[in-house]
Amino acid sequence: MSTIKEFLTSDHGRCDEYFADMEKNATESLEGAKESCEAFIHETEKHFQMEERVMFEEFESKTGMTEGPTAMMRHEHEQMRNLMSQMREALDVDNKDKYLGLTETLMILLQQHNMKEEQMLYPMAQQHLSADSDRIIDMMQSIVID
């Protein structure tokens, strides 16, 4: 099985594909944008919850660091959830310009966020949690969201 770092980095790539699909559909029709936006939000929320409910909890339990990088990542997740909510609202009122502006802001935040996780947090997590990688990955894969 892969490492925690490999698993979560790969999942970033999967979410990026949903984002690209969402951007592409926005240029074609608002209905297509709505569907792909919902798919992106769902998959991104699943990724956030895999981190927050499993990996962050395991990392904090093992290291005792609760106010460090995981706290910052949770804060950034909340910022991105807020942007995604605003994207939904813009699509609900057919405001394509606002939607596109929000997606641009989200893309920048996501890129910066993912870089921090992939270059800092995931290697730290792997260092502390490597003995439990398989169990942690299995737990993350079992996350279900509504």
Regions found by a protein language model. Give the residues of each.
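Small-residue-biased structural context
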Residues: M1-D146
